[in-house]
Amino acid sequence: MASPALISETEAWKDLKAHVEDIKRTHLRELMGDTERCQSMMVEFDNIFLDYSRQQASPDTINKLYKLADAAHLKQKIDRMYNGDHINSTENRSVLHVALRAPRNSAICSDGKNVVPDVWNVLDKIKDFSERVRNGSWVGATGKELKDVIAVGIGGSFLGPLFVHTALQTDPEASKNARGRELRFLANVDPIDAARNISGLDPETTLVVVVSKTFTTAETMLNARTLREWISSALGPSAVAKHMVAVSTNLPLVEKFGIDPNNAFAFWDWVGGRYSVCSAVGVLPLSLQYGFAVVEKFLQGAHNIDQHFSSAPFEKNIPVLLGLLSVWNVSFLGYPARAILPYSQALEKLAPHIQQVSMESNGKGVSIDGLPLPFESGEIDFGEPGTNGQHSFYQLIHQGRVIPCDFIGVVKSQQPVYLKGEVVNNHDELMSNFFAQPDALAYGKTPEQLKKENVSEHLIPHKTFTGNRPSVSILLPTLDAYRIGQLLAIYEHRVAVQGFIWGINSFDQWGVELGKSLATQVRKQLHASRVKGESVEGFNFSTKTLLTRYLEATSDVPAAPSTLLPKI
């Protein structure tokens, strides 16, 4: 008998659908009273502790989710990814970001070729180059050391490296290595972003890393040309070769741009942009800032979770459990969003990165075979570090819509502070909130409790908390380069699990193409209107009105301008 075309046609899916009513008749107050249940929903791996007991789920729910995983052939799909099969079927590509952090002696193949030696050739090249820049043997055009780096990229070429950079900034080892150096990221084509990035920097001491696989990404290349002009106008055109390097595979365009092809660092078609932080995309700028040894620990942490994900049984497998619970929350309980809430300011850029990893991967409306999905998939991801978020959007999380939450805590702070006479230290104050918030969401506060506290009758409806709001708690022992790599890989694989269950392609992103193609038409119109004075034609009434208004208000923009660089 042929397998069902959609996961929703399987008995395991239908069984979970029927099970929803059983769960809706329970409350987390009741579920949390079952100690045996709670113990069964706690998993530890390498001192990372996952507690998912505050999910709206019983042990029966979890067993049914395991059956759903079997029906979706989850283990086989994971194996196919690691084996280099072309699981990105719409682009006919392998998906092998796990190879980017594999040990040197590993064998991971794509199209019959072990790609790990190629990965390490690039890593060795990055190590050599970054060490030469950091020790002053590679200098700028005027002989000065290159202390400042601007990485130019967008999307996955920016969000992942920025997350890791921000997380490492306050790590004692990393911050010591970065002393006297600065790393910035230029992503947005908005000239304000360029202005902010070059503000306070000297072209003589600045190295620019241009990240574009094809060297044709419109926003990235315009920003790269802007920084090339910034360098050339100060130091002369010949300085570009000493002040700009590339992460790209298009060596002819790299050379045409003015960058020595020997200073181009490769990555491959089997690396998706949002999964590329462990490639030269992230490793090069991060190594320039923190040294290769620190970044290598980050890669080792990610590899540690890669091994765990591929080998651990589902009931002990952290990414699998998180992925299955997300499917349960989205497709069965009907919760469309997820809040990522790290109780560590160092993780302030985690949510924006995972927002892209998750929403670009799983924001699909059809199956991998092109069939419309008759169920909800994908999550709306957002988040802020605690306790900042508590004073922002937690109001809605507590008394508005039900939004499942990921609480991420760190046992030992990167930067401990102790003040004489305080009841608790700063980190304990932070963690007090980390431990309290999940219970507040789970238990809530009843009208009966409020009455016992003599709350005024007219305020009781306003002060009632319904509770029964699901969350998971992830406790990391520390937050160093190794643990940051682990955390990244947990979320990457969690997203893959969701896509494997839903039966979608989590590794393409056709949704970004339509807007880009329409922008090309607008770009041509703006050029024709500015240079030739042509009126706006070929657009709907709304767009024509807006474009015309924009052109009229910027009529002072010269048709053939001389170069003007941003100034702050």
Curated annotation (Swiss-Prot):
The keyword ATP-binding does not apply. PROSITE patterns: P_GLUCOSE_ISOMERASE_1, P_GLUCOSE_ISOMERASE_2, P_GLUCOSE_ISOMERASE_3. GO terms for molecular function: carbohydrate derivative binding; glucose-6-phosphate isomerase activity; monosaccharide binding. It holds the Pfam family PGI. PANTHER family: GLUCOSE-6-PHOSPHATE ISOMERASE. Homodimer. This is Glucose-6-phosphate isomerase, cytosolic.
